[in-house]
Amino acid sequence: MTVTFQNNPVSISGSFPKVGDRLPSFTLCGADLNDLSNEDFKGKKIVMSIFPSIDTPVCSKSVKVLQNALMTRNDTVLLCVSADLPFAMSRFCTEHAVANVTNASFFREPAFTERFGVNLNEGALRGLAARAVIVADEFGVITHSELVNEITNEPDYDRILMSL
């Protein structure tokens, strides 16, 4: 499977989850440096926004757009996942007044990108995650999955929100 980065093909590996699948299990590092897993979000809908780094324009914009769109939804968690250290993600949220977001890093578990089918195998971003959004209902069943074809493009916000 491939995506593009600045119109250059980049191979990705792993199995990208599809609508109707169960959300794969995961263990990530939270902002407080403690582990986060599927169990922490039981009974909640999850919008999992996966991206290369919070310090890129498209990644930061997508976090802000999704946070604003989901602000009043008490039944939904916005889980932002990247290789960034928790300190960088916390700094971003403080500097940009981003709240109601759960930041998670896969820096301790690089296998996360394989398990979720977003592992960038080559190019300048090798080892980071491709841009993707996966939405799961309160039972852990995927209701939306989007692997963004061009890493520098934003996800389809309307389809994300319609899947909730």
From Swiss-Prot:
Contains two disulfide bonds. The active site is at 59 (cysteine sulfenic acid (-soh) intermediate). InterPro entries: Redoxin, Thioredoxin-like_sf, Thioredoxin_domain, TPX, Tpx_CS, Tpx_Peroxidase_subfamily. It is an enzyme of class 1 (oxidoreductase). Residues 17-164 form the Thioredoxin domain. Keywords: Antioxidant, Disulfide bond, Oxidoreductase, Peroxidase, Redox-active center. Belongs to the peroxiredoxin family. Tpx subfamily. The active site is a conserved redox-active cysteine residue, the peroxidatic cysteine (C(P)), which makes the nucleophilic attack on the peroxide substrate. The peroxide oxidizes the C(P)-SH to cysteine sulfenic acid (C(P)-SOH), which then reacts with another cysteine residue, the resolving cysteine (C(R)), to form a disulfide bridge. The disulfide is subsequently reduced by an appropriate electron donor to complete the catalytic cycle. In this atypical 2-Cys peroxiredoxin, C(R) is present in the same subunit to form an intramolecular disulfide. Homodimer. NCBIfam families: PRK00522.1. This is Thiol peroxidase. The lineage of its organism: Bacteria, Pseudomonadati, Pseudomonadota, Gammaproteobacteria, Vibrionales. The gene is tpx.
